[in-house]
Regions:
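Gram-negative/organellar outer-membrane beta-barrel architecture
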Residues: 2-199, 225, 233, 254-261, ...
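Extended beta-strand-rich architecture
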Residues: 44, 179-327
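A short, hydrophobic secondary-structure junction motif
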Residues: 123-130, 206-207, 324-333
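Short glycine/proline-enriched coil/turn segments at helix->beta-strand junctions
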Residues: 135, 287-289, 333-335
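Conserved active-site loop/cleft motifs that coordinate metal ions or position small ligands
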Residues: 291-294, 329, 336-342
């Protein structure tokens, strides 16, 4: 469920919307996070403020704040106007706080759910994005940012080791700092019968100081959709790898919604590398309802033991998994509702439901 309202003050526009999707699922997966006794800790929602002409020269200001039951994210972005043939500059400041379930979560109920491992991450980043002018099919973004990462326990205190005494940071101190140069390229090809999307991200840690993290990481997502009469067949392949210095929180998490359904978040595994494949067949039943059948599979490519502290092995994660299922999607003028039923390789069944955002700030 959700609500949205727009307020106009001159050229400024404020959008307020509430979204229950992620938070209802999270309440079934995570243990109680800190400040549970505070009534405000149960407040969930999003606040978005946009100004299209901040200083009278078409400068754009974007401020968003998202709060869930267990996580929060604050983003401030300022975009300067440029000619169409030049890259658009955006200055971004972001702070997020969330439980680290994907890496340090503990699988329960035959890996169908993940419980809290008592580790949370506070991330602060400051940087600049350069959005290159898009060609007919290609677009790209280059960014450079400073990141400061602090592991916290459920009481909000800084920690440098997990409950088993293994380091949570690469430096061994209560925090990690790094400067990251990132290049993202996107390719899109569409026609009346099919589409193909490809996204490639490459990140490089720059050694500004001797104790800062040096690494190279890449991720890719390729998806292909084909119309088969009234039905749509969608296939998706994603993966990545990281070399160089590494903290456990930088590992690739496998399992959960958007990865391998039928498993809890990160319950399949976490490694230096990963590969996930998804296939889905959807068929409209009427104008507002469609049925869907899907199959997901993923693997850490036997790289779980290469993550510092080997959290996947200590938590008994299998390293590979497959999930099958079906579901319904309901479309209306108020948004989309979806219900998915999945079964994993351990014959454990899971039910996923969601109410995606009714209003977006983008």
């Amino acid at each position: 469920m959700g609500a949205q309202r727009s307020i106009h003050a001159g050229k400024a526009k404020i959008d307020v919307n509430v979204d229950f999707t992620h938070n209802l699922c999270a309440s079934l997966m995570h243990n109680t996070f800190r400040n549970a006794g505070n009534p405000l800790s149960l407040l969930i929602g999003s606040l978005c403020i946009k100004h299209p002409n901040l200083f009278g020269g078409s400068e754009k200001l974007h401020v968003s704040c998202d709060k869930g039951l267990y996580d929060s994210n604050v983003l401030v972005a300022f975009r300067r106007p440029r000619e169409e043939c030049l890259a658009h500059q955006s200055f971004v400041v972001q702070h997020s706080l969330s439980p680290e379930i994907g890496i340090h979560g503990i699988p329960i109920k035959n890996f169908s759910q993940s419980g809290s491992g008592g580790v949370n991450l506070s991330r602060l980043s400051v940087g600049m994005d350069l959005n290159e002018p898009a060609s007919s099919k290609w677009s790209s973004t280059t960014s450079i940012k400073f990141e400061h990462v602090r592991p916290l326990n459920d009481d909000g205190r800084n920690i440098s080791r997990d409950c088993d005494g293994f380091p949570l940071t690469c430096s061994g101190s209560p925090h990690d700092s790094m400067v990251v140069l990132k290049q993202e390229s996107r390719y899109t090809k569409e026609n009346n019968h099919s589409f193909f999307h490809f996204n490639l991200q490459i990140e490089q840690g720059i050694p500004v100081l001797s104790k800062w993290i040096i690494f190279n990481r890449f991720k890719f997502v390729a998806s292909k959709g084909i119309k088969l009469g009234p039905a749509l067949l969608l296939t998706r392949l994603s993966g990545g790898s990281i070399v160089g210095d590494m903290a456990p929180y930088q590992a690739f998490s496998i399992g959960g919604i958007g990865s391998v359904r039928g498993y809890g978040e990160g319950a399949v595994g976490s490694g230096r590398s990963c590969l996930v494949a998804n296939s889905e067949l959807s068929l409209p039943l009427n104008n507002m309802l469609e049925g869907v059948a899907f199959m997901d599979c993923g693997t850490d490519l036997r790289s779980g033991c290469l993550v510092p502290g080997n959290p996947a092995l200590r938590h008994g994660k299998p390293g590979s998994g497959i999930g099958l299922g079906y579901g319904l999607r309901f479309k209306s003028q108020f948004g989309h509702f979806q219900l998915h039923y999945a079964i994993n390789a351990f014959n454990e069944r899971s039910l996923y439901f969601g109410l995606p955002n009714l209003g977006s700030c983008y």
